[in-house]
Amino acid sequence: MKTVQRPLWFVLVAVLALLWNLFGLFSFYVHFTASPEVIASWPEAQRQIEAATPRWIFVPFAVATIGGVLGSLGLLLGRRWAEPVLLLSLLAILVQFGSIYAITPTWALTGIGGAILPLCIGLFGLFLWWYAGKAASRGWLR
């Protein structure tokens, strides 16, 4: 399949996606390496959520963030494998946040306001997967 010239806005979206996902990877690092002293400095609600969160939640968190970075890098490089990697990232986002809301007191402690960021993360993950599919169908990925 012949690769078609990608428009500038495609590259801009890919760069923004990479930056967004690098921020997510940093968030993963901060949560994964947080010492008891750091956790003690967090607001009470966040400490309760952290205490109730099982360690296995870090597996989908890692898959979501690393997959997001790799998928965004794949988009930037114009690689077709970006689409399935971004799908894997999206699925991991759904598992991560679905599990957190199912087994921790997140909803009770943060209410609707606490759901805004996870919702935005999920929607952006969905957008990136869709965007990669459109880019592949237009011949922008090889």
Feature locations, PLM:
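Topology signature of small-to-medium multi-pass alpha-helical membrane proteins
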Residues: 1-142
